[in-house]
Structure formats: structure tokens, C-alpha cells
Design a protein with these regions (language model features):
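N-terminal beta1-alpha1 cap of cysteine-dependent amidohydrolase-like domains
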Residues: 1-58, 63-71
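Fold-independent oxyanion-binding glycine-rich loops
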Residues: 8-9, 29, 46-47, 78-80, ...
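Flexible, glycine-rich phosphate/dinucleotide-binding loops
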Residues: 12, 35, 84, 91, ...
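Amide-donor transfer/coupling interface in amidating biosynthetic enzymes
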Residues: 106-157
Length: 157
């Protein structure tokens, strides 16, 4: 299985290492020509969603990736990636891919000092270690969106 990892900014290396441990082959998406390769899934990593969104547009990668996601490309998104997929971002007019009917709250857990680690239940998987560093959470979802996990009554997956 070949997984493309958005590698413009953020925590892409951590995702690649874990995917390779699980037996996947990873390719990094850094420029438009990288999208010419075949891949079976996509990872949108944590980082800074505003920077990632800006770079995707400047590098002319945005429309192609948005179409692939809309067409059903399996996509894993963490932190900034979650923000990129949201149809609404609390207190912000601009959205990015807008592919999941949900509203997210950026930096919902506060500043760096508000970071924490926990182990919580993930639907269909079991207990999963989770780390939150200036992480978003999901304020609300529309019909058809499955909630996979909550932390302190906040939707996180």
C-alpha cells in the first residue's frame, strides 16, 4: 500500500515513520509533480493549517487534492489536517478543503502550556494514546459524520 503524506510543513515525518512500521510505502507530497504518482491514501498531518493551506494554493496542489478527497481518497487527518478538512472553522471565515460537514475550534486546548497526554477509547480500535498540543476539537458534526472518540466531552475524532 502506498500512502502520500503532505510534507509541506508540520509533523509529516512522525506519520511516515509509523506508516512504514506498519508496512506501508510512503511518498512525500512537496510539489505539484508529486501528485502525478499513484497512491492509495493520504495523510494530512499536524502543523499550522493556515501555512499548509497557503502553501497548497501557492504550489498549485490544492484543487487536485481537494478533488481526490471529494472523490473518496481515504484520508487520515491530524490536528491541522482536521482543520483543512472542516466545512466550518469557529470564528474564521476562510475554510480549506471543506470536505467534512463539521465545525472545528482551532487551538481549542489553549497554548503550549495547556498540552496534555491521555489514553482514550477510539471506536473500532480500543484504547489509544493521544497527545494534544494546541490541538483543535470538533464543535459539531452534521448528519452522516461518525463520532469516533471524545476527550472531556469534546469530539476529537
Amino acid at each position: 500500500m502506498k500512502i502520500a503524506v503532505l510534507a509541506l510543513q508540520g509533523a509529516f515525518i512522525e506519520h511516515e515513520k509509523k506508516l512504514e512500521q506498519l508496512g506501508a510505502t510512503c511518498i512525500e507530497l512537496r510539489q505539484k509533480s508529486d501528485l502525478d504518482q499513484d497512491f492509495d491514501g493520504l495523510v494530512l498531518p499536524g502543523g499550522e493549517s493556515t501555512v499548509q493551506g497557503k502553501l497548497l494554493k501557492e504550489l498549485d496542489m490544492f484543487d487536485d487534492l481537494q478533488k481526490r478527497i471529494q472523490d473518496g481518497l481515504p484520508t487520515l487527518a491530524t490536528c491541522a489536517g482536521l482543520i483543512l478538512l472542516a466545512k466550518e472553522i469557529e470564528n474564521q471565515n476562510q475554510t480549506y478543503f471543506s470536505t467534512i460537514p463539521m465545525m472545528v475550534k482551532r487551538n481549542a486546548y489553549g497554548r503550549q502550556l495547556g498540552s496534555f497526554h491521555t489514553i482514550e477509547e477510539m471506536k473500532g480500535i480500543g484504547k489509544v494514546p493521544m497527545t494534544f498540543i494546541r490541538a483543535p476539537y470538533i464543535e459539531s458534526v452534521q448528519e452522516g459524520v461518525d463520532i469516533l472518540s471524545k476527550v472531556n466531552d469534546n469530539i476529537i475524532a
